[in-house]
Amino acid sequence: MNGDSPFTEYFGINSYDDSQDNYITVNNGSDQDAVVILKNITSKKIIRNVYINKHTSYDIRNIPEGIYEMKCVYGNDWNPNLLFNGMKLGMFQSNVHYSSQANYKDYFNMFSERTENGISIPYYEVTLHKVSNGNMRTKKIN
């Protein structure tokens, strides 16, 4: 399942830009699997949904330029046959909770920048468990 896109039928086909070598590394250090969702804050479009197994990492690559908010669905016991709004999308069956970035300052700026030394390509690393003195705040969502 690691790297699968379980909500594509609901959100649409994932968007990629092969001309961009940017990425977000997601380290899921928690005891729950997660589906990470990237939403472009300008267009409001969900451009990616990625399943990340507990205690694994995954690189979300070739993200179209833009500024993105990350939302997560966490849980255990994935059931691919569960229905959502009449669609068979699947969902976790236990320990389900949701989170989103709490502050716009934590959004991901995925615009490449030309510098005097060349092109600066954005990359980020996110850890999906509580980190003491961590630098990204989340809020619970429904």
Over which residues does each language-model region extend?
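Exposed aromatic-hydrophobic patches
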Residues: 57-62
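Primarily secretory-pathway and cell-envelope proteins
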Residues: 1-43, 48, 73-142
